[in-house]
Amino acid sequence: MEWFLREVCNSEWNEQQDAGRPWAEGTALLRARFPEHAGLIDAYHTRWKETLLGPIDGSVAILAELKARGVRLLALTNWSQETFPVARQLYPFLQWFEGIVVSGEERLVKPDLRIYRRLLERYAVDPAAALYIDDSARNVAAVEALGMHGWWFHDPAGLREHLVELGLLERGTRATSRD
């Protein structure tokens, strides 16, 4: 399985769907290149939900606290336009965002500066007044080049501490509602 995910349905191939390539086209290309793995390639597509790691509970709790405090919430994700609607159904907390820019819909992926600019322009965000959180150092570096404050996410505890330092959360508080 590790070989299959490294050599066939790898991150570079998956990023092409995140950039807007239709899944049917992406899987057809792989089936032509790896006909002996056609069944697994098709299964990867039809069973992709099983590859999702799920939400990080501590992060969802932080998001709930920010929402409860009235903090404006926007999101930017590298995700296929075909599969993101399913993620919206699986993860109710995605409804808490005022807006979400999805790479597959924009035909751009992070860390391309154009996708960050699109978010800033679409939602009239002042880069100097925004905090961008990502688990990728290269994505954080990209937003910092645009004048945004970036935070490289490692774990919910570190994020919570940083948000307390910025005055966005209070020390020792936790939201209990996840509506």
Predicted regions and their residues:
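Short, well-ordered coil/turn segments that N-cap beta-strands
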Residues: 71-73
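Acidic, low-complexity intrinsically disordered regions
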Residues: 9, 19, 44, 75, ...
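N-terminal helical cap/lid subdomain that shapes the substrate entry/recognition surface
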Residues: 1-61, 68-69, 80-83
